[in-house]
């Protein structure tokens, strides 16, 4: 693939913050990334989801809550159903499902916060339907806290690498100035955290977001999934 800033930052954040590492190589204008095997989300929703058992649908709903939370926290945009895969894992007498992003070129670019929340894309409506059908509010809260806790632990593990990446990103022009201004205002409205208003770049926003997460990962009342 052709190298661009958003995609490289997106892959770096995926490698450090997601449950699974992602191997990749950048050489000048070329980018080689590890293939992520799985069923494209749009195909899964159309051909596989209707055939899943009720237990499997509940497990998929749980994974989707965590995936949605992960994308929102790390500002990975445009996660429509064709930009992620659903991975079936056979475990003795059952099949469990994991969800992973496969397209990272909308990392920290758009100015609308909703773009970083997969739940709002019409292509993902079927996933949101099973979340509403299968999970109670308390369960959604629990899974959001679990995901935030996991990301916080991964931040500690990758502390030095993350600091270096954010230092570079803060000095880089990843997006348009008006997108930064719009996004920081929207995030401020959700968090009431004044420090977001001081951000001058998408790198600043990512740094403030991750610091805010580590301080407040148990506070899920700010943003509702349903």
Predicted segments — roles?
Residues 17-21, 51-55, 118-123:
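Short, low-complexity, polar/charged sequence segments that are solvent-exposed and flexible
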Residues 29-34, 63-64, 129-138:
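Short C-terminal domain-edge/linker segments immediately following a structured domain
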Residues 43-50:
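AlphaC helix of the protein kinase catalytic domain
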Residues 93-226:
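C-terminal catalytic region of ATP-dependent kinase domains
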